[in-house]
């Protein structure tokens, strides 16, 4: 068979094609590579956001550990902040056991100087406030401020103790830093210095703070008269005796880690023959309706109360954000829950 020959027309086409296969200029290559990098970064951010939403709790939001929801447009919150911030002193605790210091906020109620023993609320914020100014746990949301409000202080005069943490105090593997037990020593110091009714100590916190409240109920089982756990969870294998405790546990249905913790605790309590009263409603209901529903739950007379916000209801109308962080304030806005807390006593 003879040698294959290109036709003249085919040869010209190949020559023309090769003439267009010029080297790509470097600036075009860099531009294409940059577009690829930007695309991969965008995909990575989307994956991290989805992962954080799925994980919920403190570890799940660590990528946004210093993210704080701006509430300047919430006129009710701004008014509450203006009403209450001036009531707090900013102080420093020197811990002789560790040699470390801890900054904290303290509200001393009217009547305390007259010798009357009054209850104390220990409020611990989430990790978004860690490492910031001492007042960050106050200004981040409704939590501590509701207990300091004129309404609450007139109805339930109480000390309000709000520590500030330098870093994440607890982790999702249940490990803790020195600042966790430092908090208890700070509490003991305040109780010695002021006329605190030690039969009416209450612990509460959101996310990291709620995890610490769970931890304290395990490691110091007889210290607190009652607790309010918000958007948090802990190792339920250590909670077999929680049936004898008095607490409210409030989470968002779409916060998978916290709602999962609630489910796990319910199972542990059931296995140990403890009674749990629970309910669920939309966080978008009018406040009057939410108060009524909370009072119906309390009227059942149980010592353990669960509230789960319907999934998605804690999010803004846009539907954007994470249910974990968006749920914090809702847990503290219910006056009936706070009133119930102050009725609990170890006596």
Pin down the residues of each PLM region:
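Active-site machinery of serine-nucleophile hydrolases
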Residues: 120, 127-181
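A domain-start/cap signature at the N-terminus of enzymes
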Residues: 51-120, 204, 211, 265-267, ...
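Bacterial Sec-dependent N-terminal signal peptides
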Residues: 1, 5-59
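C-terminal catalytic histidine-bearing segment of alpha/beta-hydrolase fold enzymes
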Residues: 253-259, 275-347
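Gly/Ser-rich "nucleophile elbow"/oxyanion-hole loop immediately N-terminal to the catalytic nucleophile
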Residues: 111-116, 170-207
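Primarily recognizes the serine-hydrolase "nucleophile elbow" in alpha/beta-hydrolase
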Residues: 192-193, 199-243
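Alpha-helical scaffolding within the catalytic cores
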Residues: 139-151, 230-239, 290-293
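Short beta-strand/loop motif that positions the catalytic acidic residue
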Residues: 249-251
């Amino acid at each position: 068979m003879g040698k294959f020959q290109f036709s003249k027309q085919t040869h010209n086409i190949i020559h023309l094609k090769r003439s267009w296969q010029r080297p790509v200029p470097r600036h075009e290559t860099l531009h294409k590579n940059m577009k690829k990098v930007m695309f991969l970064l965008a995909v990575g951010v989307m994956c991290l956001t989805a992962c954080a939403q799925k994980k919920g709790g403190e570890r799940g939001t660590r990528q946004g550990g210093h993210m704080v929801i701006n509430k300047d447009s919430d006129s009710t919150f701004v008014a509450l902040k203006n009403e209450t911030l001036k009531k707090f002193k900013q102080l420093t605790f020197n811990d002789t056991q560790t040699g470390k210091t801890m900054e904290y906020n303290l509200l001393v109620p009217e009547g305390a100087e007259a010798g009357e023993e009054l209850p104390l609320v220990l409020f611990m914020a989430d990790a978004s406030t860690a490492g910031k100014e001492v007042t960050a746990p106050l200004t981040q949301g409704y939590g501590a401020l509701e207990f300091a409000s004129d309404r609450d202080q007139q109805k339930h005069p109480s000390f309000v103790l709000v520590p500030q943490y330098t870093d994440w105090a607890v982790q999702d593997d249940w490990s803790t830093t020195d600042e966790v037990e430092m908090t208890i020593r700070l509490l003991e110091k305040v109780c010695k210095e002021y006329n605190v009714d030690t039969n009416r100590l209450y612990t509460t916190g959101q996310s990291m703070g709620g995890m610490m409240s769970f931890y304290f109920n395990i490691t110091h089982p007889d210290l607190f008269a009652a607790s309010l756990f918000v958007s948090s969870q802990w190792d339920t294998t250590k909670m077999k005796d929680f049936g004898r405790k008095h607490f409210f546990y409030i989470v968002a249905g779409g916060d998978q880690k916290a709602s999962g913790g609630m489910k796990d605790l319910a199972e542990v309590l059931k296995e140990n023959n403890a009674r749990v009263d629970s309910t669920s409603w939309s966080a978008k209901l009018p406040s009057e309706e939410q108060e009524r529903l909370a009072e119906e739950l309390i009227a059942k007379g149980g010592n353990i109360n669960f509230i789960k916000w319907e999934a998605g209801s804690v999010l803004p109308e846009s539907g954007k954000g994470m249910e974990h962080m968006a749920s914090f304030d809702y847990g503290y806005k219910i006056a009936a829950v706070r009133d119930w807390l102050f009725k609990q006593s170890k006596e």
